[in-house]
A protein has these predicted regions:
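Helix-boundary and loop/linker segments of multi-pass membrane transporters
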Residues: 1, 122, 167-169
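Non-catalytic, topology-defining segments of multipass membrane proteins
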Residues: 4-133, 195-245
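Transmembrane alpha-helical segments that form the membrane-embedded catalytic/substrate-channel core
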Residues: 20, 69-76, 132-159
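Histidine-centered catalytic micro-motifs
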Residues: 24-36, 146-153, 177-193
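Flexible, active-site-adjacent loop/turn segments at secondary-structure boundaries
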Residues: 42, 166, 188
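Short, motif-level signal for alpha-helix interfacial/capping segments enriched in acidic residues
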Residues: 128-131, 158-168, 172
Length: 245
């Protein structure tokens, strides 16, 4: 029953966040195997968080609808290609052959729901259906303020997740909204642990982990200077103090 409910909410959550769930299952498995590997083109976090952005481009990533400028590089565009029968590099390299048909089917369902939202908006002469179904990622991208804490400013191509990943302490409301993913080092070390158990896991292994940032503000106190330095020197990274095991 729990597995069944997990699958239902995974499908719903994936649609809400523009992830085709089959593709995301396998590409995210790759990410957890090779965290921040610049040699792996399908490590999403590496592609998103390790391109040494300027402070200007970093700040623009929080501006509503700004991501539409790069629609051809978005997950939505990839889903449309999968729905139309195109084989993308991530489909070829990450998704098992027996899962490809499932990926295409779910991609087509996503596209049909997007089209239906536009049709309903047109019929009602009201933008709300499209804004709530197709556009949330674009007007709600302020949520990136959480996501950006995961790996930004940290080293690449290091197998020890404690160096490449950051944990932050959030207030209870932020923690609930973020599904406890602020315990991100713990999540990478033990990806099969459910998110609601990450605080307990963190407490059990805290003597083996680098010190977590105490808040969003504390995290960005180290992230923003690192962005400025990395834009000028791409060999720079934040060095975390990691306990020996």
């Amino acid at each position: 029953m729990i597995s069944y409910l997990n699958e239902i909410f995974y499908q719903i959550g994936s649609f809400m966040t523009d992830f085709e769930p089959t593709r995301w299952t396998w590409s995210h498995f790759r990410h957890h195997s090779n965290t921040s590997s610049v040699s792996d083109p399908h490590d999403f976090e590496a592609a998103l968080f390790h391109q040494y952005p300027s402070l200007k481009s970093f700040l623009f990533s929080f501006v509503p609808f700004y991501e539409l400028i790069y629609f051809k590089h978005s997950f939505k565009y990839e889903i449309i290609k999968h729905a139309l029968g195109f084989t993308t590099p991530v489909m070829r390299d990450c998704i098992p052959q027996n899962e490809i048909a499932k990926c295409r089917l779910i991609s087509r369902i996503h596209v049909l729901l997007w089209v239906a939202s536009f049709a309903l908006s047109f019929y009602l002469m009201n933008p709300l259906p499209a804004l709530l179904i197709f556009f949330p990622r674009y007007w709600g991208n302020i949520i990136n303020i959480f996501n950006m804490t995961q790996h930004l400013g940290l080293p690449e191509d290091v197998k020890d997740h404690r160096y490449t990943t950051r944990s932050v302490r959030f207030n209870p409301i932020f923690s609930f909204l973020y599904w406890h993913m602020e315990y991100h080092v713990e999540h990478h070390m033990f990806p099969s642990v459910p998110s609601y158990n990450l605080p307990k896991l963190s407490n059990l292994i805290k003597d083996q982990l680098p010190k977590a940032n105490t808040s969003l503000f504390d995290a960005y106190k180290e992230i923003i200077p690192a962005i400025i330095k990395q834009h000028k020197d791409n060999t720079y990274f934040i060095k975390k103090s990691v306990p020996s095991i």
